Amino acid sequence: NRPLVSLKLATTLDGCIATRTGESQWITGPAARQRGHLLRARHDAIITGIGTVLADDPAMTCRLPGLASRSPIRTVLDSRARLTSQSQLATTAGDPPTWQYTCIGAPTENLGTTAIERCEVSADQNNQVDINAVLTDLADRGITRALVEAGPGLSAGFLKSGTVDTLYWFRAPVVMGADGKSAAADIGVSDLADMAHFALDATMPVGEDRLEIYSRRAAA
């Protein structure tokens, strides 16, 4: 009762998405970014978090020639309704649509009269938008394939929830070490049995980078 969920990561070899100061554009090269846009065109919805939106003001569209009309519905998980009317997601909300998922009772004044569709769902134990509630609502709206492009917190949330079916991992041939920011935050692993388990389905060069495709599997 939920869409097929894909998580896209673009990192260094050691799994970093940005420097400690937040610089991230661009770790992977043009070919990997083009492949990422193709992934967007192949999904009904793209999911990100409000932290990414406030930091980067992304368009979250497919910008490949001939595929702009295949841009997915843009979905923002925004527990406290912090998305503003000046963001790209708000100013272009009609084409493609933008859906804002907030916790029930979140404030309403930030968006004004923009065309964003607001969707209220229950909160989880951390007072954040409940990921499973969002996925259920997306399925009810006819979404069958959703792509997650998000920061460490939301990526970790999807991994922890066990809802990531496919993982697309673009790795650049560079190493950042402890100076970098990890692609995923804490997912509550205290024992090896708690880890998220995936099986490698394919790996291929993409320009100077490498794409690894994994599918979710049960723990041994």
Located regions from the model:
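Short, loop-centered acidic/histidine patches that primarily coordinate divalent metals
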Residues: 151, 170-173, 206
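Active-site ligand-binding patch in enzyme domains
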Residues: 2-144, 153-156, 220
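Secondary-structure boundary/capping motif
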Residues: 144-145, 170
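Flexible, gly/pro- and Lys/Arg-enriched active-site loops
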Residues: 161-198
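Conserved histidine-centered catalytic loops in small-molecule metabolism enzymes
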Residues: 104-106, 186-220
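Preference for bulky hydrophobic residues occupying beta-strand positions
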Residues: 7-9, 169, 214
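Compositionally biased, intrinsically disordered low-complexity regions
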Residues: 24, 107, 114, 179-182, ...
